[in-house]
UniProtKB/Swiss-Prot annotation:
This is Leupeptin-inactivating enzyme 2. Zn(2+) 2 binds at D722, E757, H872. Its EC number is 3.4.24.-. It comes from Streptomyces exfoliatus (Streptomyces hydrogenans). Residues 513-530 have a biased composition (Polar residues).
Length: 1090
């Protein structure tokens, strides 16, 4: 059993209460962290289509990787999709800081895609074309339909991944074949080959980290997860009974592994201490290695490193070789990967990491000294180094200067200019100290920044890397990196001079830099970034600006790309960066319906930025009559689901690529229509994947009506009736609701569930995450599963309930005489809500049960045959849909939406205002902050002027901005003067628009000579883990064990008044003295002051 002692020891305030309970509590939210602020800023930039990013109704960005860097900077990378298909070559990356400012961004391409997604060539035919690109193919790893975007030209293509061999080396080749014509498009190889130093490291004996288990030691790093070294022939990690490794013989594989582990561990440490990177992968992992390849080579294959030999049979696991190969791994695990890189960039990246690791290890002669040559001591074929970074022509006459010939140059030779740039940046042209001189291509003399700073600048450029990276894009990326690292512009200017020194010309995307305090720049955002306007009406969005560097400046706003019949106005048209403006888009009665992209430009003193607004012009006015849903549109969605399934193994099972692309298709449609869309990751699902939740703005949130359908299918087939029919029906209803934009009397939420086929897991996960208040807010849930069965019936869940009334009323109006859905009871997602006490109903047309004679007489169809003869089968395609049943189901959903949640009159504009958190404290001389949130309650969004009153003498409260569009927020900052009297004060925040609303903030000013009786929560959150607390003296309050198990908290108090003016620590000690484990929860340490 476990025991736990609570000890109050000399080491808090005046009187403390500690509570402990043996029950789990959730951890506090981590939303307001530097990383979260950076990610939120990056997400907003992507959502707004900032500068070269694309905001289109057909295209989406999905966040993939967040990499912390130095100086509170974060690299946030995104992959792009088009109508549910991955866009290879369309990725982007945003560099943002912990204060929530966008510092730089780079996009692989800013071209908007408009291609057919229907393949004319089969995946099998594309595979045959792809196989011809390798000498031998061991395995077809995967095949998928993508949009290949290269040189700003989009092509629908099959991407086939093959493992095998070229004429000289192993290969993992990605081949792209035009899916319309069958022509080869391009390819790239994950396997990157190189060579290097096999000299032993020293002076000996060197120390390496190994793993010990009992009496066995293995060459597996216990700290650097994933790093190990194995015999290439057997694949077995080296192990032995002692922790003494290697023979000193360079032909010994074990010695080669010692050299590899030493070099890889030094590189890991360099990444952490110099560059701020968490391991080779960036998330605390490395990769395994093998020694013993018979080739005169070494390579990275996408998941491991393999070391070969030199002509003397010595294993080439020296520092610069090992660091070079793991440099390829870093290249693969930074934004953009290595796909489509210009020739030479990958090899030079490996060489740069080799030079950095040599410099970090700083070994003396005769070992591998820091020298900026590659493989200088291995003498691979008796000719010395294989590359020279300060003088590339010294080896094989490699080029030192960039030219238009570089993209077509052999990859190792093409590394010359980038290697030369790195040396010029690190050391300059005449470094002295025994280091070699290096000449520039333009005859200038340069001073270096040092190898560590050069490494930071280059690595920062890698964090802005995209696919199809080029020398010219690296120039822009490293200039942005240098600018972010150094406000004085010294690093920026030297980085620029080094690029000029190898003849890489200036680019239009290059940033500019002036000394600290003068380098003024800003960013822009839109909230929301898309919307629908009816003919004869208007829609608004808030254009936000943020100071990213330097001081605020005047920004003039303009809009372009307006469709015929739509005009734009800004209020105000010019703002100071840091302020916002309201953009109003007004459509005439004759404005052409359809989608378009409005480009909003902000022109500063010398720089400009753009954001994109996705506008949809609707062709009809909102009204109270339920609309007729066009079944052809529903069938079009089903066709898209069918296409997605055929391109991804024939199904859309939860967790599969088919499901992911289906979700992306639905999500893209909803975002373009103006919905607030959320993906919820179902961690408890059989196949972990995402639910999709879409909220239509308007209507009271505490009066919510939900409409749901499961999006997943079984692996046996495309799942078009089960349940593409329900999913497509809801999607089209959601789009029509957005187009009509009627007055909402209730809030409407749509949901597409994952993992239903494995046991209603997605919807159950969602319901279980709801608080009691959130459950109470849902006044009804409607489920739609298999609503297009070919031999279908007309079934309603809980047909005689109040919730079912609108569904029943519509089908009854068609003389369909609907029946209870007995077959589907407990078998679809409505059951999850029913179990939580939420009223439910829904439509179904039947599954594998058989239609009775009476039903066939009433509804038509075949008696004694299954409602759906293709239930859970491969034939559940678009041919397995009864359009009449589907149409009646879709129209019935619209009838229910309108009857349950739509009003008849144009709504009065109204909004709400709330402060979060609603209370805070600060000492005299200190400060605190909160967020003022607004929301549109009814009608259209409106401009809300914000003010704050009630601040006592000495307290200054400010809002930024002081005017927002309802639905946006403002920052409340409270500064407490040094002479402010302690006490609790109420600040009132007032929002004024068509009406006025207020919200309050309770400010507690602490300190002072007097004492107000009150209870202070000194540990209001929940913590897990341990802290290094120590007691110099103390008193045990109580000892607890698992015998004291309690469903609530056991509260203990102690009078600490005797320690007035001193510091007191409460210590909680847990001791395991038997195998039975016991958990304790300690929470809410409070102080009662009197």
């Amino acid at each position: 059993m476990a025991a736990m002692a609570l000890t109050a020891s000399l080491a808090g305030a005046l009187a403390g209460t500690a509570s402990a309970a043996q029950q789990a509590q959730p951890s506090p939210s981590q939303k307001d962290t530097p990383a979260a602020r950076a990610v939120a800023a990056a997400d907003q930039a992507v959502d707004s289509g900032l500068d070269s990013l694309v905001n289109s109704s057909q295209e989406q960005y999905e966040r993939r990787l967040v990499t912390p860097w130095v100086k509170d900077l974060y690299s946030v990378s995104y992959e792009r999709s088009y109508r549910g298909l991955p866009v290879v070559g369309g990725d982007a990356v945003v560099l943002a800081d912990g204060t929530g400012k966008v510092r730089a961004l780079q996009s692989a391409s800013s071209v908007r895609i408009d291609v057919s997604t229907q393949a004319s060539v089969s995946a099998k035919d594309a595979e045959s074309t792809s196989r011809a690109k390798l000498v031998s193919v061991d395995k077809v790893e995967s095949s998928r339909l993508v949009v290949r975007l290269k040189d700003d030209k989009p092509v629908l293509a099959w991407e086939t991944v093959l493992s095998g061999r070229t004429k000289t080396a192993p290969s993992k080749l990605h081949v792209f074949v035009d899916a319309r014509t069958g022509a080869f498009v391009d390819s790239y190889d994950e396997v990157v080959a190189g060579t290097g130093n096999s000299k032993w490291n020293g002076p000996g004996p060197v120390t390496i980290d190994t793993t010990n288990s009992g009496s066995t030691y293995t060459l597996r790093d216990p700290v650097r997860t994933g790093l190990s070294c194995a015999d290439y022939s057997t694949g077995t990690v080296f192990s032995k009974s002692s922790d003494s490794w290697g023979t000193g013989n360079p032909t010994s594989k074990e010695t080669g592994c010692v050299d590899l582990m030493f070099a890889a561990q030094k590189q890991w440490d360099m990444l952490s201490q110099w560059l701020g990177r968490n391991g080779v992968s960036g998330n605390g992992r490395s990769f395994p290695a093998k020694v013993g390849l018979s080739d005169l080579n070494a390579y990275w294959d996408g998941s491991s490193v393999t070391i070969g030999r030199n002509s003397a049979g010595e294993w080439i696991a020296g520092i610069d070789v090992v660091a070079h190969e793991y440099g390829h791994a870093i290249d693969s695990n930074t934004p953009g990967g290595t796909s489509g890189q210009e020739s030479g960039l990958g090899e030079a990246t490996g060489d740069i990491f080799g030079a950095l690791t040599e410099a970090f290890a700083n070994e003396p002669a005769p070992y591998d000294t820091p020298d900026y040559t590659v493989g200088e001591v291995i003498n691979l074929q008796g000719r010395g180094p294989i590359r020279n970074m300060y003088n590339p022509p010294a080896v094989n006459n490699d080029p030192a200067c960039y030219s238009s010939a570089i993209p077509g140059t052999e990859v190792h030779a093409a590394a010359g200019p980038l290697n030369h740039w790195f040396y010029l940046l690190a050391e300059g042209t005449s470094p002295g100290g025994g280091k070699p001189n290096s000449s520039t291509c333009n005859g200038t003399s340069l001073t270096g920044v040092g190898v560590q700073n050069a490494g930071k600048i280059f690595y920062g450029g890698m964090l802005l890397k995209t696919s199809s990276m080029s020398y010219k894009k690296y120039r822009t990326a490293t200039l942005s990196s240098a600018k972010s690292l150094d406000a004085t512009c010294d690093l920026f200017n030297k980085t620029k001079a080094a690029w000029d020194g190898i003849s890489v010309p200036a680019q239009t995307a290059d940033p500019t830099c002036t000394p600290s305090g003068q380098n003024n720049d800003f960013s822009m955002s839109l909230s929301p970034s898309s919307g629908t306007v009816q003919q004869g009406a208007s829609v608004t969005t808030t254009v936000g600006t943020t100071v990213t560097t330097g001081n605020a400046q005047s920004v003039t706003l303009t809009a372009s790309g307006l469709p015929a019949g739509v005009s734009a106005s800004f209020n105000p048209a010019t703002v100071q960066s840091g302020q916002s403006s309201v953009l109003t888009l007004t459509a005439t009665a004759n404005a052409a319906p359809g989608a378009s992209t409005i480009v909003v430009k902000g022109q500063g003193a010398s720089l400009s930025h753009t954001v994109d607004y996705a506008l949809n012009v609707g062709g009809t006015q909102p009204g109270n009559d339920p609309p007729d849903i066009d079944v052809a549109n529903v069938q079009a969605h089903l066709t898209q689901f069918n296409t997605i399934a055929s391109q991804n193994g024939g199904h859309r099972r939860a967790g599969s690529a088919g499901y992911t692309q289906s979700l992306a298709y639905v999500k893209g449609k909803l975002q373009a229509a103006g919905y607030t869309v959320t993906e919820q990751n179902c961690t408890s699902c059989t196949y972990p994947s995402n639910n999709l939740i879409a909220d239509w703005p308007g209507g009271p949130a505490d009066q919510t009506v939900m409409f749901g359908a499961h999006l997943d299918g079984v692996s046996a087939g495309p799942g078009i009736n089960d349940n593409g029919s329900g999913s497509a029906t809801l999607l089209e209803n959601a789009l029509v609701l957005a187009q009509k934009n009627p007055t909402m009397t209730k809030h409407v939420r749509f949901a597409w569930w994952t993992d239903e086929e494995q046991g209603l897991n997605g919807s159950e996960f969602y319901v279980n995450q709801l608080s009691s208040a959130q459950r109470s807010a849902i006044k009804g849930y409607y489920n739609f599963d298999m609503v297009g069965s070919t031999n279908g019936g007309y079934f309603i869940n809980n047909v005689n309930s109040t919730t079912a009334a609108p569904l029943k009323a519509y089908w009854t109006s068609l003389n369909l005489a609907p029946e209870e859905n007995t077959e589907g009871q407990g078998r679809s997602d409505d059951y999850s809500f029913q179990q939580a006490g939420i009223p439910t109903s829904g439509y179904a047309a039947g599954a594998s049960a058989r239609k009775t004679s009476a039903q066939a007489t009433k509804w038509g169809g075949t008696a004694n045959a299954a409602y759906d003869p293709c239930y859970h089968s491969s034939c559940d395609t678009t041919n397995n849909i009864n359009a009449t049943v589907l149409n009646r189901s879709a129209d019935g959903v619209a009838y229910a939406v309108w009857k349950q949640a739509v009003g008849g009159e144009t709504p009065a504009q109204d909004f709400s205002v709330a402060v979060s958190p609603s209370a805070g404290s600060a000492a005299p001389g200190g400060s605190t902050s909160a967020t003022v949130n607004t929301a549109t309650v009814s009608g259209a969004a409106q401009t809300v002027a914000l003010s704050v009153s009630g601040a006592p003498a000495g307290v200054t409260a400010t809002l930024s901005p002081t005017s927002v569009q309802s639905g946006s927020s403002s920052a409340l900052s409270v500064q407490v003067g040094a002479s402010t009297a302690p006490g609790t004060y109420t600040l009132t925040v007032t929002g004024s628009g068509t009406v006025s609303h207020t919200s309050t903030y309770s400010l507690t000013v602490t300190g002072g000579g007097s004492c107000t009786p009150r209870q202070l929560v000194t540990n209001g959150g929940f913590e897990s883990g341990s802290s290094p607390w120590s007691a110099t003296a103390g008193q045990t309050l109580e000892t607890l064990s698992n015998l004291n198990a309690n469903s609530g908290y056991a509260e203990k108090s102690y009078d600490l008044s005797q320690f007035a003016g001193q510091t007191v620590t409460l210590k909680f000690t847990g001791t395991e003295d038997q195998s039975l484990q016991t958990s304790f929860v300690v929470d809410d340490v409070t102080v009662q002051v009197s």
